[in-house]
Amino acid sequence: IIEAMTPVDFFRRADMDVATVSWNNRHQVVSSHGIPVIADKILPELSDEQVINTDLVVIPGGLPGATNLADTDRVIEVLQQVHDQGGMVAAICAGPLVLEKAGLLKDRRYTCYPGCEEKIKEGHYINRLVIHSDQIVTAKGPGASMHFALTLIQALNGKNAANDISKETFASESLKFEKK
């Protein structure tokens, strides 16, 4: 849930137009840890025009969610269409499995939740928190959620916007633990 909702929260703080979309024809989605979330839209409600005007699609992590998304033809079509039109596609945790199914990791650097790289045949795995490779941004897992969101904000709205959100949320300070 962290890797799905942190980007949504940060994007809304940055005044980005955001819609959460459920793939399964129900507005309520349940996270891999049993937390219910109400999506703004369901996948069949997305028109081709809305997809054409999309600047970014974010695929959250978690299993079996990532597998379910990878097995949904319309999800793969949307990812490919947004990418082919010059939009950004991003995935976190197990989400890069979906990007591979869409053919978007070929010849690209990426990161993912440890162990998922063994299932990804294309692309070049790099063990880092966040990787930005052209139109593709990937992140390792829940602990990378803030960095992931800020990387996407910077790519779409500029460094100043990302810095503003980082300051507002104390993101840059959040990983500094006091030694006792």
Show the residue positions of the predicted features.
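N-terminal beta-loop-helix "entrance" segment that forms/cooperates
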Residues: V21-I42
